Amino acid sequence: VREMMIPLDDYPWVRIDDTLKYAVRVIEEAQLQVGRRASLPRVLLVFDHADDLVGIVRRRDIMRGLEPNFLVSQPLDERVKFFDVGVDPHLSELSANWDFQKVVKGLRDQSSRPVADVIRPIHTSLGPEDQIMKAVYEMVSLNESLIPVVEEDRVVGVLRSVDVFHELA
């Protein structure tokens, strides 16, 4: 695992009380250099103020957290209808159900929410000396795409499924 992990210093992270807006900026600006390949992260690590890893946040968690309140309170099939707008080749009007300004305001309001509202817990970790097949088993059995690497009770890096897959290929 040590040979394939991304060192903690090279991986993007946020604090638990950072805003979703800040998390969007961090994940958008981050680029990882993995061997000779450039790669974009799909997950941010989340730390508390004692520098303990408390969870992760994926891009889709951030997007879910940005959904305006007036949509969240509706059943999923009603939310989908809200965005079921036919394409107007002249773009002169949008559907009566579509209130773009309301959506934009809702997104802006939600962007000030803390990352803590959408955090995902850590389900497992690996040691730097663990074999790659243990990582494969953990990723597959727990449906995880990123696992922290811990040495002496301290996070030293992360292992991503994309890097494991690349190595196996």
Regions found by a protein language model. Name each.
Residues I27, A38-R60, M139-L142, I147-V162:
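A glycine-centered beta-loop-beta connector
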